[in-house]
Amino acid sequence: MAISKEEVLDYIGNLSVLELSELVKAFEEKFGVSAAPTVVAGAVAGGAGGGAAAEEKTDFNVVLVDAGANKINVIKAVREITGLGLKEAKDATEQTPSTLKEGVSKEDAENFKKKLEEAGAKVEIK
């Protein structure tokens, strides 16, 4: 029996950030594609559009730039925000920059940034 699109989306929606990253790499290798040109094209279009494109942005990514000196508190905050296991959260804090959340609202992104910065991390919202 075939798997429905909805089942695939549900499965992907339940993956951790690290698992999603591995899935993207597997897609790139299997199908010979790269996610990079999409980002570059978006950046070029954004530059040409001026301020209007920046105002329309509704989805944001939370990127951990540096875990700082207090890594234990940062790992705890990463686990709370992402739902990752201990090992995955530790790996995410050690392999910076690391995208912790993708496609979240500005309000959620700001809340996540605040929690991580209170724990001692350096965070960017993109």
Swiss-Prot record:
Coiled coil: none
RNA-binding as UniProt keyword: no
InterPro entries on file: Ribosomal_bL12, Ribosomal_bL12_C, Ribosomal_bL12_C/ClpS-like, Ribosomal_bL12_oligo, Ribosomal_bL12_oligo_N_sf
One BP term from GO: translation
GO MF annotation terms: mRNA binding; structural constituent of ribosome
Gene Ontology terms: cellular component: cytosolic large ribosomal subunit
SUPFAM superfamilies linked to this entry: ClpS-like, Ribosomal protein L7/12, oligomerisation (N-terminal) domain
Keywords: Ribonucleoprotein, Ribosomal protein
Recorded superkingdom: Bacteria
Signal sequence region: none
Keyword Cell membrane (UniProt): no
Pfam families, alphabetized: Ribosomal_L12, Ribosomal_L12_N
Function of the molecule: Forms part of the ribosomal stalk which helps the ribosome interact with GTP-bound translation factors. Is thus essential for accurate translation.
NCBIfam families documented for this protein: L12
PANTHER family in UniProt: 39S RIBOSOMAL PROTEIN L12, LARGE RIBOSOMAL SUBUNIT PROTEIN BL12M
Family per similarity comment: Belongs to the bacterial ribosomal protein bL12 family.
Subunit structure: Homodimer. Part of the ribosomal stalk of the 50S ribosomal subunit. Forms a multimeric L10(L12)X complex, where L10 forms an elongated spine to which 2 to 4 L12 dimers bind in a sequential fashion. Binds GTP-bound translation factors.
Name of the molecule in the record: Large ribosomal subunit protein bL12
Organism placement in taxonomy: Bacteria, Pseudomonadati, Campylobacterota, Epsilonproteobacteria, Campylobacterales
